[in-house]
């Protein structure tokens, strides 16, 4: 079975670990979000790609869900002693090595997709991890801080400001001019199932869909497309997805996120059992819906979510 997954960071990575447990023999291609990418200290940092790579490769800080296990921060402390910022983004020593290798390879002329493949040679994540594009795309958020309206990088909004001010707009800068990375459209065309994990629908999955040709390829793939709600009981399972949903005019409910994706894209949608009351609303929107437990409390819970998603895909296929 060929499965394509559009993934952001922590939620996407943990779902993928469950998917690998549920169907160990499946051929899984992950299209990773690069809208979170940021340049720090002259290095290109790809938080979502790295979170997927580290999680599936066994090097993730399990407690945080991001960054490396057994991490130290000597380099960060030395940079701070020189007054070199920013100090709000916690890059560890082991993590720095990844970004140095990536930046060196990009400087030598390799595209991000080839660099990501090379990095995965070390981590052996057991999936094919492709960035959504080799072009530079950065998600920016329009905010008002101290009476001044300005655009900040998504990482600054998320990490430094902790989404403490309303997001007035969310824009994937550069997306309109970008092209899907090599292998992205081919993977979608060859897929048996396409899954949207419980990643952020605006700044993770939404950014991938903003790359010209990706949304159209998924809509026209002719195979089941099933998503899992990142909203449980009208609140994000983790993170601050409600803040960026508000910026695009979507209420923070499982049903509203399904409607945001739309029946032209989604065939099936899983909501948590606490949101069973919204199943009818989703089905009225033309999307087959089931209520199942959606809390990834451990690996088996994530694996069961993946099984439910694949079961719904087969239900859609047989309809």
Identify the meaning behind each predicted range.
Residues 1-4:
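Extreme N-terminal starter segment of soluble prokaryotic enzymes
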Residues 16-20, 204-217, 279, 283:
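Short Gly/Thr/Asp-enriched flexible loops that form oxyanion-binding sites at enzyme active sites
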Residues 24-26, 221-225, 266, 287:
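A short helix->loop->beta-strand "cap" motif at the edges of active sites that frequently abuts
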Residues 29-33, 224-231, 267-273:
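Short internal beta-strands
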Residues 32-172:
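Electropositive, gly/pro-rich neighborhoods at or near active sites that engage anionic ligands
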Residues 168-187:
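Active-site glycine-rich loop that binds ribose-phosphate moieties when present
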Residues 209-248:
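Redox- and metal-dependent alpha/beta enzyme cores, enriched for Fe-S-associated oxidoreductases
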Residues 238-319:
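C-terminal functional extensions of proteins
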């Amino acid at each position: 079975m060929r499965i394509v997954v559009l993934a952001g960071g922590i939620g996407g990575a943990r779902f993928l670990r469950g998917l690998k447990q549920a169907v160990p023999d499946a051929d899984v291609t992950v299209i990773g979000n690069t809208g979170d990418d940021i340049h720090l200290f002259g290095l290109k940092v790809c938080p979502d790609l790295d979170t997927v790579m580290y999680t599936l490769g066994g090097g993730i800080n399990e407690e945080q869900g991001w960054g490396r296990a057994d991490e130290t921060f000597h380099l960060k402390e030395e940079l701070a002693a020189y007054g070199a910022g920013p100090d709000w983004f916690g890059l560890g020593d082991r993590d720095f090595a990844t970004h140095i290798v990536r930046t060196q390879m990009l400087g030598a002329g390799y595209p991000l997709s080839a660099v990501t493949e090379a990095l995965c040679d070390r981590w052996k994540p057991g999936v094919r991890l492709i960035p959504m594009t080799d072009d530079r795309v950065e998600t920016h958020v329009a905010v008002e801080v101290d009476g001044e309206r300005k655009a900040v990088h998504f990482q600054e909004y998320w990490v430094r400001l902790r989404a403490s001010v309303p997001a007035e707009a969310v824009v994937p800068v550069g997306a309109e001019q970008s092209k899907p990375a090599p292998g992205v459209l081919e993977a979608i065309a060859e897929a048996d199932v396409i899954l949207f994990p419980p990643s952020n629908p605006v700044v993770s999955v939404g950014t991938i869909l903003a790359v010209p040709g990706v949304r159209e390829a998924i809509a026209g793939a002719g195979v089941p497309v099933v998503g899992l709600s990142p909203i449980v009981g009208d609140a994000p399972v983790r993170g601050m997805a409600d803040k960026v949903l508000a910026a695009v005019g979507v209420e923070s409910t499982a049903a509203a996120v399904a409607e945001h994706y739309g029946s032209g894209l989604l065939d099936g949608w899983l909501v948590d059992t606490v949101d069973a009351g919204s199943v009818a609303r989703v089905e009225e929107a033309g999307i087959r819906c089931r209520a199942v437990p959606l809390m990834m409390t451990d690996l088996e819970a994530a694996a069961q979510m993946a099984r439910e998603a694949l079961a719904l895909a087969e239900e859609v296929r047989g309809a």
